[in-house]
Amino acid sequence: MYFLYVGVFGALGGMCRYAMNLWLGGGDFPSATLAVNLIGCFLLAFLMRFLAEKSRVSLVLLNGIGTGFIGAFTTFSAFSVDTIQLVQSGAWLFAVSYVLASFIGGLIMVKFGRMLSNKLLNRGEHRVG
């Protein structure tokens, strides 16, 4: 069952990444890859914490979403290739900006994802009834 969930969610994540490339692709800067990786950092931190704590989501579904959808949506390999291509084309400023935005931005997005999940989880604890 795990393979089915990971496969289905992986297909959806790959299609969403492809759509982002169509929407944001082109130009000298790999903005589509940066966007999917930053969004993926936020989603993984938020969804895995929130779904694991709040709802009765099965481990199979969590793996499908985390490993399948977010794993296929994000791409470290494209980040690496994009960085090397920027360096080889002499676009050092773009390359350094891309690496810094990816790593620092990724950490910030994880922090925001966890903060939002914590806020929503704590809000539910304060309700009466």
From Swiss-Prot:
UniProt binding sites for Na(+): G71, T74
Catalyzed reactions per annotation: fluoride(in) = fluoride(out)
Transmembrane segments: 3-23, 32-52, 59-79, 90-110
Membrane association type: Multi-pass membrane protein
Highest taxon in the source lineage: Bacteria
Activity-regulation annotation: Na(+) is not transported, but it plays an essential structural role and its presence is essential for fluoride channel function.
Transport recorded as keyword: yes
Signal sequence range: none
Classification via InterPro entries: FluC
One of the GO BP terms on file: cellular detoxification of fluoride
Keywords: Cell membrane, Ion channel, Ion transport, Membrane, Metal-binding, Sodium, Transmembrane, Transmembrane helix, Transport
GO cellular component: plasma membrane
Compartments in which it is found: Cell membrane
Keyword Membrane among record annotations: yes
MF annotations from Gene Ontology: fluoride channel activity; fluoride transmembrane transporter activity; metal ion binding
UniProt function note: Fluoride-specific ion channel. Important for reducing fluoride concentration in the cell, thus reducing its toxicity.
Family under the similarity heading: Belongs to the fluoride channel Fluc/FEX (TC 1.A.43) family.
Name of the protein described by the UniProt record: Fluoride-specific ion channel FluC 2
Species in which this protein is naturally found: Listeria monocytogenes serovar 1/2a (strain ATCC BAA-679 / EGD-e)
Taxon lineage: Bacteria, Bacillati, Bacillota, Bacilli, Bacillales
